[in-house]
């Protein structure tokens, strides 16, 4: 699927092998507001800041926890694939700052990873932030 955003509209196109064209198959994509999926590399839990640890702990507690809802973790190690799933089904993608390599805090590259995905997510009705500021407002 090819995803294109212009202005505030996000559209998905699928390649048609017969016509050799990309056909509009998912017009006006909007992120589902009520979803119980999150994407995070939980193997780095011990390196995260306490607020992220708390949020993931609460998600993992499910119905018995303070969020009173069962959540599913999805992580495939590809931001593009995770963002595609979020566009199709809703959810949250989390790539938190950690203290594993303090000199490299935040490993998503702003110009060709974070900004393009943030623009798509924001235009589809979602939010994209560092946890402290909107990604699209970073200079």
Regions found by a protein language model. Give the residues of each.
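IMPase-like, lithium-sensitive Mg2+-dependent phosphomonoesterase catalytic core
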Residues: 1-139
């Amino acid at each position: 699927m090819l995803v294109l955003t212009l202005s505030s509209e996000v559209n998905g196109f699928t390649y048609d092998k017969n016509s050799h064209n990309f056909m509009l198959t998912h017009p006006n994509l909007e992120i589902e507001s009520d979803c119980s999926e999150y994407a995070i590399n939980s193997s780095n839990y011990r390196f995260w800041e306490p607020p992220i640890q708390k949020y993931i702990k609460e998600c993992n507690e499910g119905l018995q926890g303070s969020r009173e809802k069962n959540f599913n973790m999805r992580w495939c190690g590809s931001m593009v694939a995770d963002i595609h799933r979020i566009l199709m089904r809703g959810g949250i993608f989390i790539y938190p700052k950690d203290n594993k390599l303090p000199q490299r805090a935040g490993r998503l590259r702003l110009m060709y990873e974070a900004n393009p995905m943030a623009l798509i997510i924001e235009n589809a009705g979602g939010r994209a932030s560092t946890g402290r500021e909107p990604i699209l407002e970073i200079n």
